[in-house]
From Swiss-Prot:
The keyword Signal applies. Keywords: Cell wall, Disulfide bond, Secreted, Signal. The keyword Disulfide bond applies. Acts as a good biosurfactant, stabilizing emulsions in several conditions (concentration, pH, and salinity) and decreasing surface tension to a comparable value to that of some synthetic surfactants. Hybrid protein-metal nanoparticles can be synthesized via a simple one step method using vmh2 and gold. Vmh2 strongly binds to Au core whereas surfactants act as outer shells. Even if engaged within the hybrid complex, vmh2 can interact with a model protein, BSA, more than a standard organic-metal nanoparticles can do. This is Class I hydrophobin 2. Disruption phenotype: Alters the cell surface structure and mycelial hydrophobicity. Does not affect aerial mycelia formation on a liquid medium, nor the stress response to H(2)O(2) or SDS. Aerial growth, conidiation, and dispersal of filamentous fungi in the environment rely upon a capability of their secreting small amphipathic proteins called hydrophobins (HPBs) with low sequence identity. Class I can self-assemble into an outermost layer of rodlet bundles on aerial cell surfaces, conferring cellular hydrophobicity that supports fungal growth, development and dispersal; whereas Class II form highly ordered films at water-air interfaces through intermolecular interactions but contribute nothing to the rodlet structure.
């Protein structure tokens, strides 16, 4: 009886190990936009964003859109001491001189 259990275990264990192998990637996923370092990310419906947008005469899209405030581009990761101490985001929308960048999604990377 014990030998059957061990035999089945030795047959099934490699199958389970092979089934759970998932390739791991540590690189950020921002293939359709640009990496930005922003002081904060807010909804377009936020009152502060509304004031800034009104003063600059910018028309944003939907109110559930995320926008980055005071952003600077991150061009090359890990070269030249590039670091972001605020929020690293991937932005796919318009960039208004870095003051407001539309369509930003926060991503977690260690820069």
């Amino acid at each position: 009886m014990f030998s059957r259990v061990m035999f089945c275990t030795f047959l099934i264990l490699p199958l389970l190990a092979a089934a759970t192998a998932i390739p791991r990637t540590d690189t950020p996923s921002c293939s359709t936009g640009s990496l930005q370092c922003c002081s904060s990310v807010q909804k377009a419906s936020d009152p502060l964003v509304g004031i800034i947008v009104a003063l600059l005469g910018i028309v944003l899209g939907p109110l559930d859109l995320n926008v980055g405030l005071t952003c600077s581009p991150i061009t090359v990761i890990g070269v030249g001491g590039t670091s972001c101490t605020q929020q690293t985001v991937c932005c796919t929308g318009n960039n208004f001189d870095g003051l407001i960048v539309a369509g930003c999604s926060p991503i977690n990377i260690g820069l």
